[in-house]
UniProtKB/Swiss-Prot annotation:
Protein name as catalogued: Large ribosomal subunit protein uL24
The keyword RNA-binding appears for this protein: yes
RNA-binding keyword on record: yes
Organism the protein comes from: Buchnera aphidicola subsp. Cinara cedri (strain Cc)
Chain segments annotated as coiled-coil in the UniProt record: none
Assigned protein family: Belongs to the universal ribosomal protein uL24 family.
Gene: rplX
GO BP terms: translation
SUPFAM superfamilies xref list: Translation proteins SH3-like domain
GO cellular component: ribonucleoprotein complex; ribosome
Length: 105
């Protein structure tokens, strides 16, 4: 399946506690259709110290994945979410925004 969102894309969160926030996609998990977005869905985890591994304990902030359907690609020029369309250019498949036909880098 071809995803319209890829790593390093600028996305906006559509639903949930972080609705309206914009971030960059760090990683995509294709097996369960989730993405990790930088600075979004941050939780605090209480970590026990492990002396054998020289790992200190404490409270760690961690980014958890969110479902890919809850994010949309963000168009900087229009400052809103947008749809993606694929097209062929010089024998290569490219992506662009549907509203203003601008290429997605």
């Amino acid at each position: 399946m071809s995803y319209k969102i890829r790593s390093n894309d600028l996305v906006i969160v559509l639903t949930g506690k972080d609705k309206g926030k914009v971030g960059i996609v760090k990683k995509i998990y294709r097996s369960n259709n989730t993405v990790i977005v930088e600075g979004i869905n941050i939780v605090k985890k209480h970590q026990k110290s492990i002396p054998e591994k020289q790992q200190s304990g404490g409270i760690i902030s961690k980014e958890l994945p969110i479902h890919i359907s809850n994010v949309s690609i963000f168009n900087k020029k229009l400052k809103k979410s947008d749809k993606v369309e694929f097209f062929w250019h010089l024998g290569k498949k490219k992506r662009r925004f549907k509203s203003n036909k601008e290429l997605i880098q």
